Amino acid sequence: MDSLTLILITVFVILILYWILQGRNSKSPPGPVNLPIVGYIPFMTSKPYLDFDKLAKVYGPVFSLKLGSHYAVIFNDFYSTKEAFAQDAFIGRPPESPFELNKETIETEAFNGLPWIEQRRFSLQMFRDLGFGRPRMEELIKEEIMDLLEHLEKTEEKPTEVRSVLASSTSNNIAILIFGYRLSYDDPRRKLLDYCIRESARQAGQVTWQIFFPWLAKILNFFNLGGTSTLSKVNKTFRNYVDKEIQQHEKTLNEADIRDYIDGYLLEIRKRHDPAFCKPVLADMVGTFFGAGSETVRLTLEWLLLTMAAYPDVQKQVQTEIDEVISRERLPTWKDHLQMPYTEAVIMELMRWKTIIPINILR
């Protein structure tokens, strides 16, 4: 081997070692060795939550690794996660996201830090004022349940696919809070919203990996590849729908009669004169509520139905408790759950066993 070849090999090895070790210092949590460019991703399976669990057994509940271009710290137990999320330092979100936000949301950092705390505080108070968790909201939810039951009765006990009707029903509960109305399942607007929510979740899942390779994402976007264009079209369709709703609410806004979340937010814009409270941010907030409050509930209900079918003994005990506490002469109320420990335990165990979001959103 000549000296030039030896020098090149030595330099190459040094560069590789430097690349592997960069980003990790004495204050960083322990973690596995990362490869250049791709980090630890090549060693991960299709179930990253299980991969993280295995790494936690080696490096402890808090460890670090590189995911593509990003250095990440993983919290893999309840106590460290709770401690971290209690700190304002973990409120922020990474700048890369599969979902497009309005430039006003990005510029004012409305979804990060202190501005986000204000958005969250206002939203929680607004939902309380609208009756969230109170008898008024219960009555609206009961109306939706009755419509869902009537729809299912039409199947005449024949095998049926429930995903679409559950999606419409759970989304309607969000629509009542946000828009002030619900939509029948065959309403074209209902079908449009269902399409946007369903496709947005599906397309986002396909392009999420690009978050870890922002340089590659820019190249793919430049050549209109990678699926982001489809997601962008879906997001634009949903945003157009929401923008029309906001415009309609502005025309009929009455300070003495706050009908829904959009009404409340529009009035808050007038009061605050805060750039983080504006109509583009409102549109993004609406998208967040539909995205987080529709698919998650729908998926939980699907698992619940499947589990009840798979475990008829459990289903029978749940039905017995329902009959004893509620009977079949009326619809349930929220306070009934205080007398239904078995049913509540079944739901809680299902959410633990079939976790629908095993890895939390990046922070």
Where are the regions that the model predicts?
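Hydrophobic mid-domain F-helix/FG-region of cytochrome P450s
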Residues: 18, 70-82, 145-150, 160-185, ...
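Cytochrome P450 substrate-recognition site 1
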Residues: 25-44, 50-140, 161-162, 166-173, ...
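Cytochrome P450 fold signature focused on the C-terminal beta-domain
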Residues: 34, 249-262, 316-340, 353-363
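Transmembrane helix-loop-helix
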Residues: 135-156
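Cytochrome P450 catalytic-core helices
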Residues: 296-314, 319-321
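Terminal signal-anchor or tail-anchor transmembrane helices
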Residues: 1-27, 172-173
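Conserved cytochrome P450 K-helix E-x-x-R motif and the immediately C-terminal K′/meander segment
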Residues: 41-60, 240, 331-363
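Conserved cytochrome P450 catalytic core segment spanning the I/J/K helices
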Residues: 128-135, 157, 208, 230-301, ...
